[in-house]
């Protein structure tokens, strides 16, 4: 997908010089980004970075102190109703009635948008198929697995056929199989032209799904770009994780062959274009465990913020 700056794709979301303060504390600071229609854009950042506040402003739930936000052609918050009718929301926690069946929960979702029962019943079969819940239509939600509940929540967010989906930590707490099934469903939505704004702590999720992403720290944008471009720009070489020794002592030994070194807890991260030379330097330390791997978004986050993403 072409980037918004170089394409004629319609703009789904535009933030221009947006800041937000609460009680004199700046929680979002001069933030600007544009999301093209049909792309998946990720917001990455530690707790307190401003992700939730940004989402609330996009939804018109709070107004920016400074700057302008436009969503699906409507300027928030004054035209919020025009935009909200075209937005589906998946919050971090399932908003389901456990005593209702799967079908009944979808009926409730539809009524939020003032859809008639006939209209809702018309779309329920396709939503059940999308969520892979055809055989669970009359099952109580309390009897579903965690992955099934998340797929039902996602299906509910699609009840009004939204142009834009806002997903807050959509796979947190799921096992790998359930997580991959959600990712597959989200990719199918992108293939249908839906726009997705994704906030996540899961770096693999961001790397797999996002066309572009924005890394936040203390309310400021510290990086923006395509995942693999950011990895190449910020890291650009293999990584060796070193466990079992004194990180400070080991860093002095291997520094001449390292492009950069990072210490996180008891782990030494060595970014090096010459992994074999580093391994040779460490052979005398029999108690060490080494993991050599390609760089990833977790490394980018550590590089930019100096700390790991909270789990």
UniProtKB/Swiss-Prot annotation:
Residue ranges of every copy of the ABC transporter domain listed in the record: 13-243
E.C. code: 7.6.2.-
Key word ATP-binding present: yes
GO molecular function, one term: ATP binding
Location in the cell: Cell inner membrane
InterPro entries xrefs: AAA+_ATPase, ABC_transporter-like_ATP-bd, ABC_transporter-like_CS, ABC_transporter_ATP-binding, ABC_transptNodI, P-loop_NTPase
Membrane topology: Peripheral membrane protein
Pfam families in the record: ABC_tran (PF00005)
Keyword list, A-Z: ATP-binding, Cell inner membrane, Cell membrane, Membrane, Nodulation, Nucleotide-binding, Plasmid, Translocase, Transport
Keyword Magnesium: no
Cellular component aspect of the GO annotation: plasma membrane
The protein's enzyme class: translocase
List of residues binding ATP: 45-52
Family: Belongs to the ABC transporter superfamily. Lipooligosaccharide exporter (TC 3.A.1.102) family.
PANTHER family: ABC TRANSPORTER ATP-BINDING PROTEIN, ABC TRANSPORTER ATP-BINDING PROTEIN NATA
NCBIfam families: nodI (TIGR01288), PRK13536.1 (NF010059)
Record function comment: Part of the ABC transporter complex NodIJ involved in the export of the nodulation factors (Nod factors), the bacterial signal molecules that induce symbiosis and subsequent nodulation induction. Nod factors are LCO (lipo-chitin oligosaccharide), a modified beta-1,4-linked N-acetylglucosamine oligosaccharide. This subunit is responsible for energy coupling to the transport system.
Record text on subunit structure and interactions: The complex is composed of two ATP-binding proteins (NodI) and two transmembrane proteins (NodJ).
Record protein name field: Nod factor export ATP-binding protein I
Source organism of the structure: Rhizobium leguminosarum bv. viciae
């Amino acid at each position: 997908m072409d980037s918004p700056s170089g394409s004629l794709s319609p703009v789904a979301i535009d933030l221009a010089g947006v800041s937000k303060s609460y009680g004199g504390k700046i929680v979002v600071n001069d933030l600007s980004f544009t999301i093209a229609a049909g792309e998946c854009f990720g917001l990455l950042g530690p707790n307190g970075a401003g992700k939730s506040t940004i989402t609330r402003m996009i939804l018109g739930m709070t107004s920016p102190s400074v700057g302008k936000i436009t969503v699906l052609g409507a300027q928030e918050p004054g035209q919020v109703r025009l935009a909200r009718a075209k937005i589906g929301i998946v919050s971090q926690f399932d908003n389901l009635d456990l005593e209702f069946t799967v079908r009944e929960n979808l009926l409730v979702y539809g009524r939020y948008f003032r859809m008639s029962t006939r209209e809702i019943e018309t779309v329920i079969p396709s939503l059940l198929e999308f969520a892979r819940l055809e055989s669970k239509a009359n099952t109580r939600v309390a009897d579903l697995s965690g992955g099934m509940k998340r797929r039902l929540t996602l299906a509910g967010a699609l009840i009004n056929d939204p142009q834009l989906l806002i997903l807050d930590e959509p796979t947190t707490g799921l096992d790998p199989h359930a997580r991959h099934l959600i990712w597959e469903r989200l990719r199918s939505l992108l293939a249908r032209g839906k726009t997705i704004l994704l906030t996540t702590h899961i770096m693999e999720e961001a790397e797999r799904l996002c066309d572009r992403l924005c890394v936040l720290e203390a309310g400021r944008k510290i990086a923006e770009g395509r995942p693999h471009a950011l990895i190449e720009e910020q890291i650009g070489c293999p990584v060796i994780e070193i466990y079992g020794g004194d990180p400070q002592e080991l860093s002095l030994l291997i520094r001449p062959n390292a492009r950069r070194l990072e210490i996180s807890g008891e782990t030494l991260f060595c970014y090096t274009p010459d992994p074999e030379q580093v391994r040779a330097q460490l052979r005398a330390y029999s108690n060490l465990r080494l993991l050599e791997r390609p760089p990833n978004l977790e490394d980018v986050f550590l590089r930019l913020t100096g700390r790991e993403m909270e789990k």
